[in-house]
Structure formats: structure tokens, C-alpha cells
Regions:
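Beta-rich, blade/repeat-based domains predominating
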Residues: 7-21, 49-68, 87-105, 109-111, ...
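A short loop-to-beta-strand structural motif that recurs across blades of beta-propeller domains
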Residues: 33-35, 70-72, 122-125, 164-166, ...
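Beta-propeller domains
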Residues: 25-44, 72
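Short glycine/acidic-enriched loop and turn motifs that connect beta-strands
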Residues: 31-33, 72, 110-113, 162-164, ...
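Sequence/structural signature of beta-propeller modules
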Residues: 1-2, 251-270
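A short beta-strand motif characteristic of beta-propeller blades
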Residues: 2-7, 41-48, 79-86, 132-138, ...
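Short loop/turn segments that connect beta-strands within beta-propeller blades
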Residues: 37-41, 75-79, 127-131, 169-173, ...
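Glycine- and Gly-Pro-enriched alpha-helical subdomains that act as flexible
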Residues: 147-149, 153-169, 173-175
Length: 270
């Protein structure tokens, strides 16, 4: 499989998201900032300096929704509005949106980059357009990648520390914890039209898992740390961390073509 490097020179790249105009948004968790890569290769800073952005979404009114210490909306003019804040949460990591524009977000209860921090489990929350929020599932040590099934009935969440892919049935609140430790540490994810999960596996490339959590195939990525993925039609993008034997592949955005199409991703309305 041929991968093309389309952006590089960052720290820990996360949150790849395709905007309505076809440009791509991504964040640098450690270096700070949210960036837009245009189809012509031009690169713009959308949100300067903001660190800890593990998830991004386009907002229905324009601008971008970012995670971090809280969840914010940065509009097209650069104005920032806090959408949701909750005391006791160290930060919000990756998130996804449903067809109504509600946000499903993983809450972190400890500083994940502090090796001495006690790994206190967090939760998966759903944030509604009125600003209310509720817990969908708990006992998630290190909430990371998050995505919804095409029918909106199931939310998938990766737990990096415990190496689990968690499958939540939204209506019943039942869950299925799938052990993916044999393949690597799970990180960001995307869903294809068949409902399969394309899961970034740190030190393990990308795995395509069926909706019930069975591994269907693996894809090699030319970097030692794969952090997240997203689709634009049958184009697959992957992001990487800041360590690689090849400097160009550290903290970069990669692109390739695959034989499936990504499921629709909805704008946020909260």
C-alpha cells in the first residue's frame, strides 16, 4: 500500500477531520494548535496554541469544536465559546457526533502524560444541544478514539491503557469489551459504510474490526506510532506521533486509497 506524506513536522498529531470544503483539520496535542490543510496543500492555523486537543468536529454554524480541558467552539472569526465544562475532569479526549449534532466525548480523570499520575477511570459522556450531559458508560481508564455506527445505535470507544475496544449499545446501555492487546494500544478510529471500525493501533498500524469487534484485516503504516484515522470517500488519512526512525514520518499526516468508503460524519450543534 502506498502512503503519501501530506504534512509533517508536528508533535503528537490527532483529531483528523474532513471539513465541508474538502480541507482537512488536525491538531497537535503536545505542540498545541489546530490546523487546516487545503486541497492545494496550503496550511493554515485555525486555533493557535491550544494543547490537549484529542478530538475535533466541524460545527453546524461554522468553525470547529475542540476538546481539551473543556469542550469549546471556535467560530470562523476565532472567537471561543465554552460548550461544556465539568469540575473534576482533567480533560476531554476524542469525541464523535451523532445525526442530531450531539457530542459523545471521552472524559479523562487523570493527567495521561504524567507517568506518576494514578490512572483513575473516566467515562463516556453524551452532551446535548441544550448543554445538558449524561454518562453513557463508565470504567474507561484512558478514553481515546470514539465513533458512531452508521445507524447511530452503537458507539465505539477505545481504552488505550487497558487495550480494549468498547462497544456500547446506546438504547440498552449494554457494552461489549473487546480485548485488542494482541494488536497494539488502540487510539483514534473511523467507521466505514459497512459499519466496520478502522482503529489506529499504536505500534501496530491500523486494524479493521467488524461491528462485533473481530479483526478483519490489518494495514501497515510507515511510522512507529499511529494515532488516528479518518475517511474522505475512499481516501484514508492516518496521523502519527512525534517519534519515528524517519523524521518525515514523525508527527505527520499520511494519505492512501482503500477499497471501502467512510461513513458520513455529522457536524456538531451543541
Amino acid at each position: 500500500m502506498q502512503w503519501d506524506v501530506i504534512a509533517h513536522g508536528y508533535g503528537l498529531v490527532e483529531g483528523p477531520t474532513i471539513a465541508p470544503d474538502g480541507s482537512m483539520l488536525f491538531s497537535d496535542v503536545l505542540g498545541g494548535g489546530v490546523y487546516r490543510l487545503g486541497g492545494d496543500g496550503d496550511l493554515d492555523t485555525v486555533v493557535p496554541k491550544r494543547r490537549g486537543v484529542g478530538g475535533l468536529a466541524v460545527h453546524a454554524q461554522g468553525g470547529v469544536v475542540c476538546s481539551g480541558r473543556d469542550i469549546v467552539h471556535v467560530d470562523s472569526y476565532g472567537n471561543t465559546r465554552t460548550l461544556y465544562h465539568r469540575d473534576g475532569i482533567a480533560g476531554w479526549n476524542d469525541f464523535c457526533t451523532d445525526a442530531s449534532g450531539r457530542v459523545y466525548a471521552g472524559a479523562l480523570r487523570f493527567a495521561v502524560f504524567d507517568p506518576n499520575a494514578e490512572a483513575v477511570p473516566g467515562e463516556l459522556w453524551r452532551i446535548d444541544s441544550e448543554g445538558s450531559a449524561e454518562i453513557v458508560g463508565d470504567g474507561v481508564v484512558h478514553a481515546n478514539g470514539c465513533a458512531l455506527s452508521p445507524d447511530g445505535n452503537t458507539v465505539f470507544l477505545s481504552d488505550t491503557r487497558s487495550r480494549r475496544l468498547i462497544v456500547f449499545d446506546i438504547a440498552s446501555r449494554k457494552r461489549n469489551d473487546v480485548d485488542v492487546s494482541a494488536y497494539g494500544h488502540p487510539d483514534g478510529m473511523a467507521i466505514d459504510d459497512a459499519g466496520c471500525v478502522w482503529l489506529a493501533l499504536v505500534s501496530g498500524g491500523i486494524g479493521r474490526f467488524t461491528p462485533d469487534g473481530a479483526l478483519d484485516r490489518r494495514i501497515d503504516v510507515p511510522s512507529s506510532i499511529t494515532t488516528s484515522v479518518c475517511f474522505d470517500g475512499n481516501t484514508l488519512y492516518a496521523t502519527t506521533g512525534g517519534h519515528s526512525e524517519t523524521p518525515e514520518l514523525a508527527g505527520c499526516v499520511l494519505r492512501t486509497q482503500v477499497d471501502v468508503t467512510g461513513a458520513p460524519v455529522h457536524p456538531a450543534t451543541i
